[in-house]
Structure formats: C-alpha cells, structure tokens
C-alpha cells in the first residue's frame, strides 16, 4: 500500500514537472485569466488606487533612501559574486539555481544520471585516464643554487612553490634511494637528507655524508652472493651527496660543474660495481637501478652545465652519447635537451632527424616537439610570407603545411604563443610542468624564444595564424581536432606549480556569468537613480508619481509619453516657450 502511494506521488510529481517544463505558457495564461475573473472579488482596482495614493504621499527623501539601499545591496552581491567566481570559477547564484531549481523545473534525476554514467563507464574511464593531469619533471629545469636562489637574492621573490619543491623531493627519493641504503652509512644519511624541508639541513647532511667517506675505514663486501669469499674494499664516495651540493649549494654554474664531475667519478664506480652484481638477487638489482638513475642524472646535468657555459657542441655530444648508452631511459626526456642545443647550433637537419624519431603517434607529445616541428616548417616560408599576398593568391602547399603545423602546436598547448609573441611576461620555469598547461608554456618559451626570433618572419607567421586554431575547436573541453579534448584540471594544477605573483593563463577563457553582469548593471542603475534623486528631488518625485499613476490606474492604456511630460510641466509650472511673430500669424 505504501509502495503504491509512493509511486502515485512520484507519478504526480513527474506530471507536474512535465507540465512546468513544456506547458509553462499555458500555465501563464491560466493565471492571467484567473486574475481577470477575480478582479472584482479581490478588489484589485481599489488596491491599486490605494497603492497609488500611498506612493503620491512619499517624499523625495524616501526615494533617495530606497535607491541608495538597493544600490548598496546590489553592490555587495556583485562583490560576493566576483569573489566566488574568481575562487571557484562559477557563479554562486547560477550554481544554487542549477542545484535546487533545476530538479523542480524538469532537471535530470540523480538515478537516471547514475544509470547513464554506469552504462557509459568504459568510455568515461578512458577519457579520465587520457585527460588526467599528470605532472612531469621539467627536462630543462634550472639549478637551485646557481639560478633559482640568485633570483631570490635579487628580487626577494620565491620562484618555486612548496608543491613544486615537494614533488622534487619525492623524485629524489625515488631515483636516488633504495631499500639497501641502510647498509652504507653515507647513503643512509642522504636518504634522510632528501626528506628534509630546510635547505641548510640538506646541505649539512650532504657534507656529513662526504666526511664519513674521508675516514679510511674498511668494509667487507661479498664477491659472490652466498659465498665465503670476501674482499676488503674502501668505502666509495657518495655520489648523491655531490649531486645535492651541486644543485643547492653551488652559486655558479662553474662550481656546480666541478661538483658534478666529482659526482660522476663516484657514481661511475658505484655503477660498475652494481652492474657486476645485479643478477645476484633483488637487493643488488635495486642497487643497480638506483646507481643507473644517479649516473644518468649526473651526465645529463653535466651536459646542461656545458650548454649553460657556452660549450654547446660538447653538450650535444654528451647528450648523444647518453642516449646511445641508455636508450630505454626516456623518463628524463633527454631528447628535449638535445633539441634545444641543436637549435642553438642552427643544425636544423639534425633537429629534423631527432623529431622524426620522437614525433611519433605512439609517443607522448610535448610543447617542445610540437612547436619545434612548427618552427622548422615555418622556417621554409616565413621569410617571404605576407598576409596581404596570401589573401590575394591563397596559400601555397608549403605555407599550408606551416600553418597546419602551427595549428597543431597551438591545439596541443594554446598558452605558448602569448609568451613567444611577448604578450605575457616570462618568469623562471618551475621544476615540474603540466603538459598542455601554462607551466609547460613558460618552460618552453623561456629557452626557445631566442630560436624563434632567430628565424626571420617566424614570429610574424605565428602572429597571423595562431588564433585560427580556435575556429576548428569551438568546444575544446568536449572535442579536440588532432588531440584529445583539453583537460579541465590544468588551471588548478598550474596554480599549484607556479608562484603567486604570476597570472596563470586559463584556456578556454572563462566568460563572466550572467548574474555578475546583471548585478553590476543593477548596482550602476540604482546608484544613478540615487544620485539623480538626491540632486533633483522634485523632478524625480514627479517622474515617480507619474510612473506610479501609469502602472497603477485602471486607465493606463490612454496614457502616453506626451501626458507624462505635460504633467511634469504642470507640476513644476514651466512657462511655455515664446513663439515668434511669424509663427503667431
């Protein structure tokens, strides 16, 4: 019985909702008809006359107070709406309307939405996995001591956020530590040092780890697992301690390079020893994996030091050798460092060869790959490109390929052109980036802006064509053209990665909600009414009385604008304009 009553109520509610959704015009006319039929019992005309008399007795001070109060209230609503929109990206009034009024006016029921979500579970999960905002290590990240700290000393601003530095600490613990670190005293100290938040504490721990190795103590190391054969060896140098000092204590790139060379000597020895013992058990295999990460990191940073110090050809050779020696370690994205160095040498044929290997459909893309490919195609036509000539004769095949490459790059990361065209100011790139986000755009433009300027006409071609990308993807959050839809979570992640003094670029740009514009107009209009009422109380009082008479009297159809102004002239006793003699005759 109860179930039948509940079902009847649900059916009745659905019928009412349906009627409000599709038959609202019929309901509106029914209400008007009822008001017309009941106008005599309800004494509508008498009530309107009473209201009109009451309004006629009001003084101008009342209207000043009324308009001033309404202006103040609408201004407070505007301030609250603007704050809510800047913080949460949506209008509070619209959100409340959608959450509470939409179900009453025929919105989607929660059960039906859950059913639809469950039926499309596979597609939704695939889309979530694709659009998940994964943070990547910046392959071109700067040195903390020699570059980031110097910026802080000069400007007093912190270029790195706590979230970014915390991610770096997690990377260091992942790449530079293993479960057997407690067996070596220096590595045990460094394992704690990577967890330290205070930079001075980390540096002190690194010095302590190096001092332990200065003691010529001896340790017994098994030559073969589960064997009775032992060899006496000196404790090896701690490579990770040199890495920390080179990254955070060195104040110049030259000092960092010296420390990295010492780290290379220590890390190479550890790598060779662990390479011989890697098949003797899981513990040795973990040590070898850690020593491999340490060695690759040191060699990559040495190549970056050479690039910073102007030895670009030496840096290119070191990167090529590193990629040949460890071809499977793609997590460091060394090819992006190589592309930047080759562009500095203007070795465009070598750049094209690297792109042919890494710009593959099965490999993850980056702004470096997409925009470098666009730069190479733009280089072939940019020196002779003219928008006026192109509009007259049309685009040639080479120009069309260049424009398509630019559109492809802009679709992948739409934030880069503003930095390349210097429409937004650059800051130091963070240690981690979000692909397709503002952080990746900053990291790319910081190093590659000079390469675009070096190619004659490339920035002009980019300026003329990059905005055409948005016509092909009118709804980038729902459907892309060459890539997956643009992820929604980039703005939130970029705000965590980038410092607070930087204005984060948002795509697609959010438009102001209707209610913010409405409250702004309402506030301005009521403030203007309050000012006019205060300055001209008699005139505004006459207008208010005339308007109340128009809308409240039963004979409002006979009124027009002429009668309003005639009444204003009578109330204020404005004399008629003098007429000329010719007009009187």
Curated annotation (Swiss-Prot):
Q: What keywords are annotated for this sequence in UniProt?
A: Glycoprotein, Membrane, Phosphoprotein, Transmembrane, Transmembrane helix
Where is this chain's protein located in or outside the cell?
A: Membrane
- Residues the record marks as carrying a glycan: 47
Q: Does the keyword Glycoprotein apply?
A: yes
Give the range the annotation lists for the signal sequence.
none
Keyword Phosphoprotein assigned to the entry: answer is yes
Where in this protein does the record say Phosphoserine is found?
A: 386
**CDD domains per UniProt:** ST7
Please give the name of this protein.
Answer: Suppressor of tumorigenicity 7 protein
